[in-house]
């Protein structure tokens, strides 16, 4: 497996974010490589300082990692609010609009962000872009009417492919849905408009644009962390 050139940046971001955690908190755990480092950093703090914390995970992978490291997890159907949600991003533009969902957990990730008192996105400098779209746009779609949904997407000009798993079958999300990765268009100067258009198509569960009130911490290889906030909560 190719070594991640930004692994140390992600670990630095994760440690700094884990320092925000205090006893009594309910955490929202995102998915992806940066979120994995945050989970590890939180588990280390819990072990060293005996923190009384609980968490909700956005994916089976994050759930398994947190559980294996001793972080108690609550029923993911019963939580109302979390104190702090921490996640990563695939692309972030200058207005802090972003694309997420490369790991296929965008639906759950957005619910955790929505429910949290504090929403923190951690990303290395490679995720900063002038215009969203180069990464591609993941869209979670219903298995029922799959071909019809895809035809509607194509009629709107959104061309892509159903994501495959390593065994060659269709990738299935934790909610039992498919991921349709849009590769055309590949630039989104006005992602709010595209998000609205996509969510009006019946059968689309969620789209990978994140346009929320969030904090963004951008980590650099020189050790610095740039901190920005879109306002709001």
UniProtKB/Swiss-Prot annotation:
Name a Pfam family for this protein: Rib_5-P_isom_A
Domain of life per record: Bacteria
Q: Write down the EC number.
A: 5.3.1.6
Could you tell me which InterPro entries the record lists for this protein? Answer: NagB/RpiA_transferase-like (IPR037171), Ribose5P_isomerase_typA_subgr (IPR020672), Ribose5P_isomerase_type_A (IPR004788)
Q: Which cellular component, as a GO term, is one annotated location?
A: cytosol
Q: Which residues bind substrate?
A: 31-34, 87-90, 100-103, 127
State the reactions this protein catalyses.
aldehydo-D-ribose 5-phosphate = D-ribulose 5-phosphate
User: Where does this protein act, in terms of pathway?
Assistant: Carbohydrate degradation; pentose phosphate pathway; D-ribose 5-phosphate from D-ribulose 5-phosphate (non-oxidative stage): step 1/1
Enzyme class per UniProt: isomerase
- Keywords for the protein's UniProt record, in alphabetical order: Isomerase
One annotated GO molecular function: ribose-5-phosphate isomerase activity
Which BP terms in the Gene Ontology apply to this protein? D-ribose metabolic process; pentose-phosphate shunt, non-oxidative branch
Q: Where is the active site?
A: 109 (proton acceptor)
Oligomeric state and partners?
Answer: Homodimer.
Q: What family does the database annotate?
A: Belongs to the ribose 5-phosphate isomerase family.
Q: What does this protein do?
A: Catalyzes the reversible conversion of ribose-5-phosphate to ribulose 5-phosphate.
Q: What is this protein called?
A: Ribose-5-phosphate isomerase A
Tell me which species this is from: Chlamydia caviae (strain ATCC VR-813 / DSM 19441 / 03DC25 / GPIC) (Chlamydophila caviae)
Gene that this polypeptide is encoded by: rpiA
